[in-house]
Amino acid sequence: MATSFLFSLILLLITALSLPFPLHASSVDPFSVGATAVRYWNRKIPNNAPHPDFFLSLLSPLTASVSSSLSSPLSISPSICRSARLLCPNSTYFQSLSSTVFIDGCTLSYTYTFTYEHTNITVKPGIFFREQELKEGNVVRMPDIANELTTARSSFLPRSIADRIPFEAEAVKSLFGLEPNTTLAKAVDETVEQCQSSPSKGETKRCVTSAEDMIDFAVAMLGDDIVVRSTVLPNGPGESIMIGMVKGINGGKITSSVSCHEYLFPYMVYYCHSVPKIRVYEAEILSVQTKEKINSGVAICHIDTSAWNAGHPAFVALGGKPGQNEVCHWIFNGSMTWVIADKS
């Protein structure tokens, strides 16, 4: 009897497999949108460098079939917003989001023409520092690198969709149904304004809305033998830490990099910019009490600040004037920097 049942089950499976699949299976892309972005990376950056988790976590979770269904007409429903890991205006996060996260609380500006308009705003300790502080054994203040943007991180849209959305504040707010004067609507206004502002002298910048866009910009600026680095773990925020072993990327030589910083937006937007005359460092971050490693930090030092605004918060924190001293800062959790791969 068991043999008869097994034979019937096998026959049923064979019959089922011989039937046509629903939804035209031959036209269904078996790969996800994220996998497509990884293959794009491999074509553009053929050096077999690993794909770090912090980058992979940004890729769209949508399947190719769902992505295709969004192509025409383009609309973002609440269910798509959730499945695509976008920041929906009706989410509980945005009901409690502080307006200071992006609009008023940006203590680390990535636009070098940025200046404070209010003299009573102070810069948190450790946001900016001098290059000489990156020495093994030094105890320094580590700024808060685990911000609310990281908590509410969205994903990139598939490039085919992102490219169809006009990068205009009103168009984005209309597509996502953002009410005027809400925190997210204000963030959209601010992000678009920052992205459309003129670059500083010697700076090349682009706001990217897809993983492929970011890869294209990094390759255009640095070539195709590159790697991407970041301070991955949000350990050591807002407290004193000890600097462990320090390594200068590319031998500590003055070089160029492409740094990308996330902006608050319904879908992932990164402000990427290439600035000459910088040094990039990797440093072990140790506990002052136990001397144990709690993180690996990436820091960038801008050697030439001559084109910066005299009111930039770096000069508020450290003193000095544009072009007078170098300015260093950590690549915060959620940001990343692309550099030429070490030859050693």
Region roles according to the model:
Residues 2-214, 231, 343:
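Intrinsic-disorder-preferring feature that marks N-terminal prepro/targeting segments
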Residues 163-344:
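Folded, disulfide-stabilized extracellular/luminal domains of secretory-pathway proteins
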